[in-house]
Amino acid sequence: MLATGQVLAQSKAVSGTVKSQQGEPLTGVTILIEGTTQGTSTDAQGAFTLQAKPDDMLAVSYLGYKSQRVKVGTRTKLEVVLTEDQNLMDEVVVVGYGTQRRRNIVGAVENISGEVLENRPNAYLLRSIQGQIPGVNITMADGKPSRSASINIRANTQSIGAGGSALCLIDGVEGDLTAMNPEDVESISVLKDASSTAVYGARGAFGVVLVTTKSARKDKISVDYSGSVSIISETVRPKYETDSQTWYDNYMTAYVGYSHHLPTGINNFFPWTQSWEDEYKKRMNDPDRSYLEWELDASGKYQYYGRNTDWYDLFYKKSTTAHQHNIRISGGGKTSSFIASARYYEQDGIYRVGDEKFRQLNARAKGTVNITKWLTVENNTDFVRRSYHQPTTYAQNLLVRRNLEHQGFPITRVTNPDGTWTAAAVYTGYANMAEGNSYRDNLKFDMKNTTVVTIDLIKDVLVAKADYSYLFNHSRQNDVISQVTYSNGPGIQISYPASSSMRTTETQIEYHSGNANLSFTPRLPEDHSLNVMAGWNIEHKRARNTRMGRDGFIVDGKPNYSLMNGIDYVLEDANSYDWGFVGIFYRASYAYKGKYLAELSGRYDGSSKFPSNERWGFFPSASVGWRMSEENFMKDISWINNIKWRFSIGKAGNGNVSPYKYMELLDFNKAGVIVDGSQRTYTSAPSSVLPANLTWETSSTINLGLDVNLLNNRLSFVGDIYQKETTDMFVTGAELPAVTGYSAPYGNNADMRTRGFEVSLGWTDSFRVANKPFNYSVRLSLWDSKSIITKYTSKSNTLPTLYANAYYEGMELGEIWGYHVVGLFATDEEAQEWGLKAQEKTFWSGDNKSWNAGDLKFADLDESGVVDNGSNRLDDHGDLRKIGNSSPRYHYGINFSANWNGIDFAVFFQGVGKRDWYPAGESGLFWGQYDRPYGYSLPWQNADRWSEDNPNAYWPRLRGSLARPTIPTTATCRKRATAA
């Protein structure tokens, strides 16, 4: 009590105000007594009061302002003035071949710091940045850890010809971001418009992603370790019918509804007879017999009466696990520094059977040596090893899902009474995967080394920089298919497939690149800032792809080419290539008083992929900026921190074509017959004539942008609108006369216009919880684009179908053409009367071309008396109409992060607001038994299918092959409008 009384006697009430440099009171400023948890915050007038001792030091902090330390002393009233923290505007952002301060950037450039990535821990870098940057669309085909992603910047399809995706550079060298260790990343910059990507020329036609890895700091040696264990769960588990009786009844309805006759077998491996069905129904309806799932028929073969076999559950787990370990060592002294990191990641597979496993090892070593005051040498070595073991079925295409859908009937069994495999176990692939002798092994090595030499010719004025990079990649894929024995009766052994086999594909890639540039930053009067950079770049890439294979293992389970007795082959296939790029680039940036900004940049590119007379192209750009917030009429408005307008215009080339498109090539193939113990090689005439003048695709972009920071940088806004004209796209041209025997030649035959916008709105703030600061940030992003074909040399005007893309002038990319459905027939009489009116209709309900109640009724929109697609051309499309668009629209991202008392929390959402989709015929989890009668039976279809008691159902009467036509209809969406 005495001690407490003494402390209270020394404390006193201290009050004060906190204001900005402009004299505006600041609300919510945190005032904390250093070394304690005692503190307070300012009110709406910027005032505060707290108990403090004369020796106490007050820490005053506020978002967007520099923190201050104020000693209490003998004062009881304090006046604190905080100055704005210009770090946000002074932040250094990595751009092409250099860096720039954010305040001076006039191109469309976005940046993500390492701190943001740390708040979104993920084993895969690209998943950590999904939804973070407007205009960046990251697409992954599936969740496999080995799968590379597609990165498109601005527009989902940049070109219908050469195609391509963003150029991804890791410390200036092209690399695979999927294989990168996220812990190594210092920052990520995304260059989106022609102005910011111009120095990369044709290599940056689709935008550029620049990843900078962490560098060593000149400090004592430190060792950091981090590890994690993850549980990875499936996002959606398909809902399908496992009740045998329901599945079988639907199968018979679908099969007979289309073919109008009884089956002889269910998908060619499960025998069907009328006597089998009679017995099966008896067992299903007789409780005393239903447990008997098999018996021997008169020929001594098994008759199966399986019940409720859940094949999907037999194959797939609901979740799996992964673990990773990271270690980093760094340190340095006055003249040198180093950093080395390593990571091991392992993820188990999703199959219950087979030992599916993915492993990845990353290692990086980076060091810098200051040899003299003006000479610095840096070396960066990166190594990645990935291995992926996948159990597979009886075929090398790994179509586990398709096998399961088409052979995994609930009425079948996995094993026979004697423990042998059933035919169903083999045809689904379950037996192969369980035995573990059929698999695909992928092994990939990446080694990359970059050496950089920097010479300060005139300190901070004239800097020369040169680098050389070498990348070596070796990948090997080994497909092993072993025979599995099943039985369809006691003592009967059948091996499947007919022969065991092994196929090996090896790819070796070597990549060399060299860069040299000179940067000049003259010492000018304070109001002026200038930087001029010019450089040279050369790249060479060579790939060799070899395939080999052999059939017939002498010893099962011993996949070795020397232990096989079949015919073997070795060949180098068309995936081998060799190309080179060379470019000369420049950039000049100027700023006047920090508010008037201008930049000129460009590149002169040459590529070996084009004929000698078309190999070179010049791609310039220009951009200007105006920091309106620095004008006198706005400079003193305290709540405005930055308002900057940006405008850019530029042109980029696209050289993403095959290296040999301008050459007349002959394909060599192996004959299908064996002569004198070997397969003969043969060739034929070229399939098409050469393009007359193959040259660069080019894209010209205009961009208008606005950057806004308000309320002490707590509120931020970034917006861009742009138009991109892509010309000379590499597509097929006009059809040649049939007498030539050639298909239409490829060439620069199409143009496309893309218009779009990007906006993001962010809020960053803090307040106190339990006398401790709670920091949080929210960011909302929205972006969209639409592309129109403005020129198409081929005048065939063919319309797209489910399985074939087609284009025409004026077409919006992603258009879906299809038939309209006006409803379902109510009675057989109505259906048959409609069918008799046009015996030449395109759509029929089955092999006998009859219509019944519950069938789809198509609209004869052109009133021709026939429902058809004419010649499937724009000028003769019959009853086809535009019924949707498959292009994703209105991409959005929502990001929220917070931290308090050492606890970090982050959540994000990303998606698209609108997209039409038409499931193709093999989309079994949508179509179910409307596709193949023996496919999945889907509960949501069963609950909303036409019947006499449910005439207003969504789904028509059940019959197979409804989903097989190549032209979509408006009958598969809730609004009766489907996609192709």
Question: What residue ranges belong to the model's regions?
Answer:
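Short, small/polar-rich motifs associated with maturation and membrane association
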Residues: 1-348, 352-363, 376-378, 773, ...
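C-terminal beta-signal and adjacent terminal beta-strands/loops
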Residues: 233-234, 315-316, 638-641, 788, ...
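Extracellular/periplasmic, surface-exposed regions of secreted and cell-surface proteins
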Residues: 117, 164-165, 366-385, 393-394, ...
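Outer-membrane beta-barrel proteins
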Residues: 158, 173-216, 235-245, 253-255, ...
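Switch/connector loops and helix/strand junctions flanking conserved nucleotide-binding motifs
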Residues: 102-103, 199-201, 219-220, 233-236, ...
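Conserved small-residue
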Residues: 224-301, 547, 766-884, 926-928, ...
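Conserved C-terminal beta-signal and adjacent last beta-strands/turns
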Residues: 328, 775-777, 885-913, 973-980
